[in-house]
């Protein structure tokens, strides 16, 4: 029985993913990639999201309205952004600020108010906000609107398209 337990523990340990390696600068900044995904990236079958700029327009149209996020290049390798999420006639969220990449994350720092910061998932094709956001972000929304869990699929990857994006009131989403 002891041999069976020992063999079972050894097999379970072999099934665990390798821990993220640390370099002299700290933890690895990108998500671990499986061997199959790495092979697909190296063969060119799929793009490496770590090398895809977030500049462009991300938008999802749905029955209640449209959710839009534009990302523009800014100084020092940073970005600026504007977003609007619409949940029907009244509830909506709108804000703008600066953004920066951190591995597979896009850190959105909103201007004004209570200093809302959202760490979004970015995979090259989509920006997905987390299911829970800081209470400081409530000021960005009217009515019962919330940015929790909102996702924005990419529709364009150029700054010109992002600059032309408008909110539902016709104002520029990414302020020049």
Language model segments and positions:
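Extracellular/mature segments of secreted proteins
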Residues: 23, 77-79, 100-103, 124-125, ...
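Bacterial signal peptide processing site
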Residues: 16-18
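N-terminal glycine/threonine-rich, aromatic-flanked beta-hairpin/loop signature
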Residues: 66-101
């Amino acid at each position: 029985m002891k041999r069976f337990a020992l063999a079972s523990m050894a097999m379970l340990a072999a099934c665990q993913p390798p821990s993220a390696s640390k370099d002299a600068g700290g933890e690895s900044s990108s998500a671990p990639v499986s061997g199959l995904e790495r092979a697909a990236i190296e063969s060119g079958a799929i793009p490496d999201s770590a090398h895809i700029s977030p500049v462009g327009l991300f938008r999802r149209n749905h029955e209640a309205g449209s959710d839009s996020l534009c990302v523009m290049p800014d100084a020092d390798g940073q970005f600026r952004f504007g977003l609007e999420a619409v949940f029907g006639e009244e509830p909506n969220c709108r804000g703008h600020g600066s953004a920066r990449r951190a591995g597979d994350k896009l850190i959105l720092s909103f201007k004004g108010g209570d200093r809302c910061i959202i760490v979004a998932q970015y995979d090259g094709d989509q920006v997905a906000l987390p299911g829970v956001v800081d209470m400081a972000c409530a000021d960005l929304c009217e009515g019962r609107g919330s940015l929790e869990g909102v996702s924005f699929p990419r529709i364009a990857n150029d700054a010109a398209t992002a600059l032309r994006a408008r909110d539902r009131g016709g104002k520029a989403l990414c302020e020049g």
